[in-house]
């Protein structure tokens, strides 16, 4: 509970449950304190790569992907703090995420569904890349080409490796000045 109080005191309004759903009490506290949740299915397989070897492209893994997404949804669907469903993290993109997205959209019409590796494909409602530079965010906000245009929320940024949170002011300026760039989740809260 103290973590949530500290987050609220520091004007944080959203947490991403990464890379799996968390304890039921956490959801209760977020409902109580008004902290938004991006709830994420327990699908994380970046060790398998993002190319042809990705489990996302191997339909024998579809039942496992579907089971994890369905369990997340059924367990958490009645929590008002959840504002976005996430299909997983860094597990490539392919048929398994297309099918889990289709299933989520068939049962859930009120909240968006995101998947970071889907980038600009159809199986995400939000463009949710990680570790984009301020210049990349501005380029997205000001694009004029006929790309798919979705809200941009960084699933991770300001990882403590490297610049250890440097540049927060510049990111905040973009979040506040560009309506399509809606913020992000700092990696990570410990």
Predicted ranges, named:
Residues 10:
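Metal- or metallocofactor-binding catalytic centers and their adjacent structured scaffolds
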Residues 4-6, 14-190:
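Substrate-binding/catalytic cleft of secreted carbohydrate-active enzymes
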Residues 1:
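Active-site-adjacent "gating/activation" loops or surface patches in catalytic cores
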């Amino acid at each position: 509970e103290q973590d949530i109080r500290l987050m609220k005191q520091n004007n944080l309004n959203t947490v991403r449950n990464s890379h799996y759903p968390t304890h039921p009490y956490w959801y209760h506290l977020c409902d109580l304190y008004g902290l938004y949740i991006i709830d994420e299915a327990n699908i994380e397989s970046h060790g398998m790569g993002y190319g042809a070897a990705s489990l996302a492209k191997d339909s024998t893994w579809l039942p496992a992907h579907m089971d994890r997404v369905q369990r997340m949804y059924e367990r958490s669907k009645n929590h008002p703090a959840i504002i976005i469903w996430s299909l997983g993290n860094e597990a490539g993109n392919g048929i398994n995420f297309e099918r889990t997205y289709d299933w989520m959209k068939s049962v859930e019409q009120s909240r968006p569904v995101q998947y970071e590796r889907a980038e600009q494909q159809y199986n995400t409602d939000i463009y949710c890349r990680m570790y984009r530079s301020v210049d990349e965010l501005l380029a997205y906000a000001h694009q004029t080409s006929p790309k798919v245009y979705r809200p941009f929320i960084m699933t991770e940024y300001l990882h403590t490796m490297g610049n250890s949170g440097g540049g927060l002011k510049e990111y905040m300026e973009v979040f506040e000045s560009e309506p399509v760039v809606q913020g992000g989740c700092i990696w990570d809260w410990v």
